[in-house]
C-alpha cells in the first residue's frame, strides 16, 4: 500500500522543477501552490536528486539534498530540497540556466528512520538492498544513502553499509562498531522519464 499516490508524486516532481527553474532564473523561492493536496502538508522526510540526462548512472548525479526527518510539511520540504540540490550541494557548482533542459528531477519521499537493534555483525541481515536506505551516525559524523543508490552501483548489503560509512566520513568498517548507530528507511521515488517529461514511480527492483 503506497502512502503517496502517483498523482501526488507527479505533483511533487513538477513542483521541484518549478522551484529550481524559478530560483536559478530569478533568484526567487516559490510558495506552495494553491490547490496543494492536503495530504502533502503532512510532515515527511524528502530528498530531491538531479541527474544529468543520457549519462550512465554512476556519472549522472548533478545534486542531491534533502531532509531525512519529517521536520517540514512535505510540500515545503520539497521546495527547499529542490533549491538546495540545485545550488547548495557542496560536491557540485550551482546549476546554470543552460543546464535546466538536460536535468532529470527525482523526488524520494522517506519513511521515518528506524534504528537497527542488536549486535553490529547482524546488521547486514537486517537490511535489504532494493528496499532500504541507510543512515549511519557516529559521534559528530553522519551519512545517508537513498535506497536506489546500491541498486545503481550493484552493491550487496555489506558494501551498502561500508559505503554509507564512507559517506559519513568514517572508516568503511565502522558499521561493526558498537557505538555506531545504523538506521534504515524506505522511500517512494518519482522521477521524470526525461527532462520535463512524464513522471513515473521508480521501481527499485
Swiss-Prot record:
Domain of life: Archaea
Coiled-coil intervals: none
Domain AMMECR1: 7-201
Pfam families: AMMECR1
Entries under InterPro entries matching the protein: AMMECR1, AMMECR1_dom_sf, AMMECR1_domain, AMMECR1_N, AmmeMemoSam_A, Uncharacterised_MJ0810
Protein name per Swiss-Prot or TrEMBL: Protein TON_1965
Organism: Thermococcus onnurineus (strain NA1)
Amino acid at each position: 500500500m503506497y502512502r503517496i499516490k502517483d498523482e501526488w508524486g507527479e505533483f511533487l516532481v513538477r513542483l521541484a522543477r518549478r522551484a529550481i527553474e524559478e530560483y536559478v532564473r530569478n533568484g526567487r523561492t516559490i510558495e506552495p501552490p494553491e490547490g496543494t493536496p492536503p495530504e502533502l502538508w503532512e510532515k515527511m522526510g524528502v530528498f530531491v536528486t538531479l541527474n544529468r540526462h543520457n549519462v550512465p548512472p554512476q556519472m549522472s548525479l548533478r545534486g542531491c539534498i534533502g531532509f531525512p526527518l519529517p521536520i517540514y510539511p512535505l510540500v515545503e520540504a520539497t521546495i527547499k530540497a529542490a533549491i538546495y540540490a540545485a545550488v547548495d550541494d557542496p560536491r557540485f557548482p550551482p546549476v546554470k540556466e543552460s543546464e535546466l533542459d538536460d536535468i532529470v528531477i527525482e523526488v524520494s519521499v522517506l519513511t521515518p528512520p528506524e534504528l537497527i537493534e542488536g549486535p553490529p555483525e547482524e546488521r547486514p541481515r537486517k537490511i535489504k538492498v532494493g528496499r532500504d536506505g541507510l543512515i549511519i551516525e557516529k559521534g559528530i559524523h553522519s551519512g545517508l544513502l537513498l535506497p536506489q543508490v546500491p541498486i545503481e552501483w550493484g552493491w550487496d548489503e555489506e558494501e551498502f553499509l561500508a559505503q554509507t560509512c564512507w559517506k559519513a566520513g568514517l572508516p568503511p568498517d565502522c558499521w561493526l562498531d558498537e557505538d555506531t548507530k545504523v538506521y534504515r528507511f524506505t522511500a517512494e521515488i518519482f522521477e521524470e522519464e526525461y527532462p520535463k517529461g512524464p513522471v513515473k514511480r521508480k521501481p527499485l527492483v
